Amino acid sequence: MKDNKNTENRMSHTRRLVTAALFAALCFGMTMVSVPLPVVGYGNLGDCFVLLSGWLLGPLWGAAAAGLGTALADVALGYGLYAPATFVIKALMAVVAYYIGLTLAGRSVHMGRRVLAHVVAAVCGEIIMIGGYFAYESVLYDVTAAAGSLVGNSVQALAGIVLSAVLITVIRSSKVLTRLFPKL
């Protein structure tokens, strides 16, 4: 009986690791779909999967997937100087989105309440992204350059909020995916 339990734990750990790697790849891929911003940096669709990583994988695995996938995309896109900040900012986004979403939605079965909880959680996560990059760019460049990226980061945040809210709603209603993500 004990060997069976150990095998289940190893399989569960392996499944989480593989799922986190998949989400890191999704974060990487969607971050690579980027548009250079006029002042500094670039806008992308990676925030959608950063938020989904937090909601679906939990704070530890979600933060690891979000931080690693997006930081590697920074390096691949030639923004290696941003990679350390991106790792921290996106990991924090995933953690905050997880805890706020969990706190607000709880075990509610009411779809409207769950969607609202995820939207509020996404907004809080995106505030961390906007504030985090503003602070980093203020130190790296100056406040004027950092202020110039606020509009682009805000548009990126809005896209991340909308896309992640739509996708989490679709995922929650999918019977197939509830086996992969039993906490839904």
How would you describe each model-predicted region?
Residues 1-184:
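Loop-helix junctions at membrane interfaces
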